[in-house]
Regions:
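Divalent metal-cofactor coordination and adjacent catalytic microenvironments
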Residues: 1-214
Length: 214
């Protein structure tokens, strides 16, 4: 059985949460499956991911017509670190030859993210400084902005870790129920529901605002 992938709690944490009486008593494969499924359920519920890319990746983000001075990033492309970060605009050639400079052309928001004591491990909006805009326009409208960065979050918040653990424990306990979710193969089918009251409360501060665009 393959181990956990981009998980927000560990299998050992889940063993402890379930009160395993003797190490190794609980089946490893089902524990791993519960942790992975719970982690992806958290992603789906919050609209973002808390695991960090190992190397910089690139995405194209369309600027907003209504607010060309702000560039909202999608939930799978929040910026986890300024190391390796580049922001470039295009004039229609596809070369993305104009690089924007942090703290000159734009600044990252939330401003205090990834600082000591901050609850946020990522930035999800670029704010143009002065007259800087993100909507470089051509004959066919605005061109997208290319963002290169290690996306995700720099750390997993304690609330996210605990919510994942609670959801994973609930999923594992369902293994004995008829047609329990762990009996079939689609991890994507697992969701945080109204019955997950504690999970919802823990994640309440990390759900992306529906007004965010990207």
């Amino acid at each position: 059985m393959t181990g956990t992938v981009n998980a927000y709690c560990t299998v050992d944490d889940l063993r402890a949460q379930l009160g395993e009486s003797k190490p190794g008593n609980l089946p490893e494969a089902q524990l791993v499956r519960a942790v992975n499924a719970a982690s992806r359920a958290v992603d789906n519920y919050t609209g973002r991911r808390f695991w960090q890319d190992e190397t910089p990746q690139s995405v194209l983000v369309a600027p907003s017509i209504a607010d060309p001075y702000s560039l909202w990033l999608p939930g799978n492309a929040e910026i986890s670190t300024v190391t390796g970060l580049t922001v470039a605009t295009d004039n229609g050639t596809g070369a993305y030859g104009t690089s924007l400079v942090q703290d000159t052309d734009y600044r990252l928001w939330p401003y205090a993210a990834n600082t000591g004591g901050s609850e946020y491990g990522a930035w999800w909006m670029l704010e143009g400084m002065g007259t800087s805009r993100f909507d470089v326009r051509g004959a066919r409208g605005s061109y997208p902005v290319r963002i290169t960065a290690r996306f995700g979050w720099a750390f997993v918040p304690v609330e996210v870790e605990q919510a994942t653990l609670l959801k994973a424990a609930a999923l594992f306990k369902r293994k004995d129920a008829p047609f329990g979710v762990l009996q079939f193969g689609d991890i994507a089918a697992v969701r945080v529901t109204r019955q997950d009251i504690d999970v919802i409360e823990l994640l309440s501060g990390y759900v992306r605002d529906v007004a965010m665009v990207g």
